[in-house]
Amino acid sequence: MAQAPAKCPSYPGSGDGEMGKLRKVALITGITGQDGSYLAEFLLEKGYEVHGIVRRSSSFNTGRIEHLYKNPQAHIEGNMKLHYGDLTDSTCLVKIINEVKPTEIYNLGAQSHVKISFDLAEYTADVDGVGTLRLLDAIKTCGLINSVKFYQASTSELYGKVQEIPQKETTPFYPRSPYGAAKLYAYWIVVNFREAYNLFAVNGILFNHESPRRGANFVTRKISRSVAKIYLGQLECFSLGNLDAKRDWGHAKDYVEAMWLMLQNDEPEDFVIATGEVHSVREFVEKSFMHIGKTIVWEGKNENEVGRCKETGKVHVTVDLKYYRPTEVDFLQGDCSKAQQKLNWKPRVAFDELVREMVQADVELMRTNPNA
């Protein structure tokens, strides 16, 4: 079985204790990413003091959280405070955790691109796998085992070559990438700390979740950006990989709420977060073009397949084998029944609405800044 049962007696903030009610201090790794930015917004609205760990960069990489500064122009911090750090540096993690003394830690930082993990396999293992251990060890070193709750961003890529449909918490894992393998280690080390040290630690097994803040090198955002450019006359054609890969796509904004709910639960448990609906990359393309008034018809097979505009006859989509993964994951569909029952969580944003929001946002972005 994939999931190990939780067997811990008592945890911070559970029951009627005062722990956690007085201080609401969250530390987020990966705060500058899609999920981190939505989570920071969500927690600030709930009255948290939010701390984020950011990697040092030659240029500011805080675009997704600029609006959360007290003074965005001057980068003056309010209830959101940023710390330079890295999941590969255990010393800095101990220093930050000891200084902040968070009540909740959300580990969202990762090299999260599956295809790139084949090129950066060792780095992906160091950040996504061992980086999680470094964080957990830092909690122990700082003596915060009994006062902090830990959320680990797990992934549907753990299921890889799926052993059953749909996938739930007890479905056996079969990762098909260095990313999935690194996240598998992270999953089990979280379970181990939960059982060995009674740490309130959970894995959120999140299926694909997108938004206008999705990174430009992820397939959904590549599609929405390219379609927006075609609509504005800035581009004629773009290339994709496996058009028939099927995914369970939700909205990141819905999924960060589930992260928080897991840490408010009385007992630490692992949860699958998903919509239960499956759509192909091909469908995502078709829906995206529909929102700019174009109908895509497909011609040819395999790498010779193209997507042609029915109205104009122009080819807008081609297939390029370089975008295929060495080992493909063809089908992912999550069963979030447990989260619905125990967390009272369910997705709000439907697939069509998600696609429309992404395309509209990218049309506005490309209209004002074509090189964004």
Swiss-Prot record:
Keyword field: Acetylation, Lyase, NADP, Phosphoprotein
PANTHER family found in the cross-reference section: GDP-MANNOSE 4,6 DEHYDRATASE, GDP-MANNOSE 4,6-DEHYDRATASE
Enzyme kind, highest EC tier: lyase
Listed Pfam families: GDP_Man_Dehyd
Lineage: Eukaryota, Metazoa, Chordata, Craniata, Vertebrata
GO cellular component term of the entry, any: cytosol
Matches recorded under InterPro entries: GDP_Man_deHydtase, NAD(P)-bd_dom, NAD(P)-bd_dom_sf
Protein name: GDP-mannose 4,6 dehydratase
EC number(s) given by UniProt: 4.2.1.47
GO molecular function: GDP-mannose 4,6-dehydratase activity; identical protein binding; NADP+ binding
Co-factor requirement: NADP(+)
Protein residues bound to NADP(+): 30-35, 55-58, 86-87, 108-112, 123, 183, 209, 214
SUPFAM superfamilies: NAD(P)-binding Rossmann-fold domains
Task performed by this protein: Catalyzes the conversion of GDP-D-mannose to GDP-4-dehydro-6-deoxy-D-mannose.
This protein's record includes keyword RNA-binding: no
Family classification: Belongs to the NAD(P)-dependent epimerase/dehydratase family. GDP-mannose 4,6-dehydratase subfamily.
N-acetylalanine PTM positions: 2
Phosphotyrosine modification, residue list: 323
Reported regulation of activity: Inhibited by GDP-fucose.
